[in-house]
Swiss-Prot record:
EC number assigned by the record: 6.1.1.21
Protein name (record): Histidine--tRNA ligase
GO BP: histidyl-tRNA aminoacylation; L-histidine biosynthetic process
CDD domains: HisRS-like_core
Keywords: Aminoacyl-tRNA synthetase, ATP-binding, Cytoplasm, Ligase, Nucleotide-binding, Protein biosynthesis
Cited NCBIfam families: hisS
Organism: Saccharolobus islandicus (strain Y.G.57.14 / Yellowstone #1)
One Pfam family, short name: HGTP_anticodon
InterPro entries found in the cross-reference section: aa-tRNA-synth_II, aa-tRNA-synth_II/BPL/LPL, Anticodon-bd, Anticodon-bd_dom_sf, His-tRNA-ligase, HisRS-like_core, HisRS/HisZ, HisZ
Length: 426
């Protein structure tokens, strides 16, 4: 007989594990709505080029790509931001700005499976399109911080930030074409600094700029006053990047005022090739990888054929976030088992179940043909707290018996008093 198992790198989530994912989803959804964001649901399958155009080297190598029956090259989405950008151009471009959208969905990457890395995983994220202000950046970071605060993680996490516009402006000034910029930033992201500097040296032929690159790439934990000092350097003015440092200084100062824990890492870049300004990742001391990340991508929508539109967003790794939560207690309703002692009691069993479900109880009807002496300990072992027992005598008197399966306390009451009886026994 053929035996089927999950595909490597993918996982089933059952019971409490599934409930934890749904809990994170509902927590994120409720928060995003309170910030004024509307939900967007995009297809899992998109054109390959949508992601390949500015996904970055690593992302392109790990995409699930296939051709459909019409010979179109398609891909399972490896992330959701490009889909939101495409949907914005297709449906929302004429709407008042900024557009605030949030999403929750599965993404697919053919990575080597390991702890914290899967081939199917979930992302929760937001995109704000049509606003280039520092207020937009702060709103996005504040929402991200508050999500982790709701999970009681805000004291543990650190948001690592940088302005990739520093690198972009220098390379643009010296006419380094986009694909080579992407490759250089990819090498920096993979901590292959010397390789990146070698390529820059070949293309810039300017030792002072290479030395400056090297200087900022080594500043992994930069203080606020250091950013202000860097902004005043003569070489910074000469390279026309003073505004990029001043922006980082302003943003950092306000984050400090908001008591958001962050660190400035001038050597930090992100693997996705579409970032143009602020970039950030959420770090937790218990794991070696980031659990969320995002940034500003002011040119992506224009690249996709839309009108120039600044944008910023982030994606939260749902499974990665769950890995760092020590004690996530999902509030569950009281589990109730309804047991009828004869066929005559079946209509009453269903009527009782309907009543209790309307009151948010979790109700299961017993289908086992076993004596009560076996059923009660069995359901107690399965996590049920209350048993509703309907026998012949109860049926004749329009009564029910309510039993606490933990304390074994039980009372018989008229059917209309069922909810009060459950509360009495708990």
């Amino acid at each position: 007989m053929t035996k089927f198992e999950t595909v490597r790198g993918m996982k089933d989530y059952i019971g409490i594990d599934a409930e934890k994912i749904r809990y994170l989803e509902s927590t994120f959804r409720d928060l995003a709505i309170k910030y004024g964001y509307s939900e967007i649901i995009t297809p899992v399958v998109e054109e390959f080029k949508l992601f390949a155009l500015k996904g970055g080297e690593e992302l392109r190598e790990t995409m699930y790509v296939f051709k459909d029956k019409a010979d179109r090259e398609l891909s399972l989405r490896p992330e959701i931001t490009p889909s939101v950008a495409r949907a914005y151009i297709q449906n929302l471009q004429s709407s008042p700005k900024p557009i605030r959208l949030f999403y929750f969905g599965t993404v697919y990457r053919y990575d080597e499976p390991q702890y914290g890395r899967y081939r199917e995983f979930r992302q929760a994220g937001i995109e704000m399109i049509g606003d280039s202000s520092i207020l937009a950046d702060l709103e996005v970071l504040d929402l991200l911080y508050n999500f982790y605060d709701k999970l009681n993680l805000s004291n543990d996490i650190t948001i690592k930030i940088n302005n990739i516009g520093i690198f972009r402006k220098i390379m643009d000034k010296y006419n380094i074409e986009d694909n080579l910029q992407e490759h250089i930033l990819h090498l920096i992201d993979k901590n292959k600094i010397n390789e990146a500097l070698d390529i820059l040296e070949k293309n810039l032929k300017n030792k002072d700029i290479i030395d400056f690159f090297n200087k900022i790439l080594t500043k992994k934990d930069t203080k606020l006053e250091d950013i202000e000092s860097l902004a005043e350097l003569e070489e910074v003015s000469r390279l026309d990047i003073k505004s990029e440092f001043l922006y980082l200084f302003r943003l950092s100062r306000i984050l400090s005022d908001l008591n958001i824990k962050f660190k400035i890492d001038l050597g930090f870049v992100r693997g996705l090739a579409y970032y143009t300004g602020l970039i950030f990742e959420v770090l937790h001391p218990s794991v070696q990888f980031s659990i969320a990340g995002g940034g500003r991508y002011d040119k992506l929508i224009e690249l996709y054929g839309g009108l120039p539109s600044p944008a910023i967003g982030f994606a939260i790794g749902v499974e990665r976030t769950l890995l760092v939560i020590k004690d996530l207690k999902v509030e569950e309703p009281v589990n109730v088992i309804v047991i009828g002692m004869s066929e005559d009691t079946i209509p009453s069993m269903f009527m009782v179940s309907r009543i209790l479900r309307k009151e948010e109880y979790k109700v299961v009807i017993n289908t086992k043909d076993q004596p009560l002496s076996k059923l009660l300990p069995y359901y107690a072992s399965q996590g049920f707290k209350v048993a509703i027992i309907i026998g012949k005598q109860e049926l004749e008197k329009n009564m029910i018996t309510v039993r606490n399966l933990i304390t074994r306390k039980q009372i018989s009451v008229p059917l209309e008093n069922i909810e009060d009886a459950i509360k009495q026994t708990l």
